[in-house]
Amino acid sequence: HGFHWLPYYCLHVKSGKIDGKARPKVKKITPTAFMVDAKGGFAHPAIEKGFEKLVPAAEKFGIAAMGVAHSYNAATLGYHTGILAKQGLLALGFTNSIAAIAPFGGKKPIIGTNPMSFAVPGRRGKIRFLIDQSSSHVAWTAVKRAQEDGRKIPLGWALDKDGKPTTDPVKGLEGSMAPSGGF
């Protein structure tokens, strides 16, 4: 993640894949449940817009939930769960993704990397604990970056199209990400 992907984001805005001018809209489902329509734009402004309703609801009722639809990549979920933890809230964040992981012993990707993050508040606006991880051994972006840089990847990061571990990022991107923990 990070600035490395900024040129791609710009290309996706220029091509129309992302609406760079989208204005997210928050819909209140119940007093503690909200749905944000990102309108084809970036997830970050949609998440921030949703937090304007989510945080007061969580503080008032002790729990609240929010979903975001029609958005581009949320990138690092820990950034968002960290914001909530700094405000004294226990935060859980999840996202879906396209199939990128073959199950243990398999060849064909059928499971998404489905990133997840958990953040626990500390004292005085601090974060006590934060985890941000993918269901793959490493993020897809790490393999993609190695491919772009012409570097090998460590064994265990990805599988080739035959389901065999590979150190070749090109073969890994053609095959599958390795599942977290090997299973």
Question: Which role does the model predict for each range below?
Answer:
Residues 47, 140-144, 177-178:
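A short, polar/proline- and glycine-enriched secondary-structure boundary/capping micro-motif
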Residues 33-123:
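A generic, well-ordered mixed alpha/beta core segment in the N-terminal half of proteins
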Residues 4-7, 19, 37, 105, ...:
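Generic, ordered loop/turn and secondary-structure boundary motif
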